[in-house]
Structure formats: C-alpha cells, structure tokens
Swiss-Prot record:
GO terms for biological process: proton motive force-driven ATP synthesis. It comes from the Eukaryota. F-type ATPases have 2 components, CF(1) - the catalytic core - and CF(0) - the membrane proton channel. CF(1) has five subunits: alpha(3), beta(3), gamma(1), delta(1), epsilon(1). CF(0) has three main subunits: a, b and c. The record marks 59 as: Reversibly protonated during proton transport. One of its GO terms (molecular function) is proton transmembrane transporter activity. InterPro entries: ATP_synth_F0_csu, ATP_synth_F0_csu_DDCD_BS, ATP_synth_F0_csu_sf, ATPase_proteolipid_c-like_dom, F/V-ATP_Csub_sf. It comes from Kluyveromyces lactis (strain ATCC 8585 / CBS 2359 / DSM 70799 / NBRC 1267 / NRRL Y-1140 / WM37) (Yeast). Pfam families: ATP-synt_C. This is ATP synthase subunit 9, mitochondrial. It is a multi-pass membrane protein. Mitochondrial membrane ATP synthase (F(1)F(0) ATP synthase or Complex V) produces ATP from ADP in the presence of a proton gradient across the membrane which is generated by electron transport complexes of the respiratory chain. F-type ATPases consist of two structural domains, F(1) - containing the extramembraneous catalytic core and F(0) - containing the membrane proton channel, linked together by a central stalk and a peripheral stalk. During catalysis, ATP synthesis in the catalytic domain of F(1) is coupled via a rotary mechanism of the central stalk subunits to proton translocation.
C-alpha cells in the first residue's frame, strides 16, 4: 500500500512539470507584446487581443497539468 501511495505522489509531482512550460510560455507571449508595442506603439490595440489569446492558451495547458495532478492525488 505504501508503494502505491508513493507512486501517486511521484506521478503528481511529475505531472506538475507542465506548469513550468506554461509559465515560460506566458513570459514569452508578454515579452513579445512589450517588444511589439515598443517598436510600434500604434499597434497596441491590435496586438493586445492576440497576447490575451496566447496567454489563455498557455494558461490552459498549465491548468490541464494541474488538474491531472489533482486527479492523481485525490481520485485514483
């Protein structure tokens, strides 16, 4: 029984590695937004919705990883 519990904790820990990728993706999206606006400030209204869309997609992958981690800990 202890082996199964240890495997659950290890699996949940490994599944949270995807959160690192989500954080890096969000940083890249907003750094690209800052660079784009600094090069051409008049494009702010055009670039901002694309940045929010990129943020949402990156955050969704992180939330999926977190959901899998919680499922491994509490549902299995």
């Amino acid at each position: 029984m202890q082996l199964v519990l240890a495997a659950k904790y290890i699996g949940a820990g490994i599944s949270t590695i995807g959160l690192l990728g989500a954080g890096i993706g969000i940083a890249i999206v907003f750094s690209a937004l800052i660079q784009g606006v600094s090069r051409n400030p008049s494009l702010k209204d055009t670039l901002f919705p694309f940045a929010i869309l990129g943020f949402a997609l990156s955050e969704a992958t992180g939330l999926f990883c977190l959901m899998i981690s919680f499922l491994l800990l509490y549902a299995v």
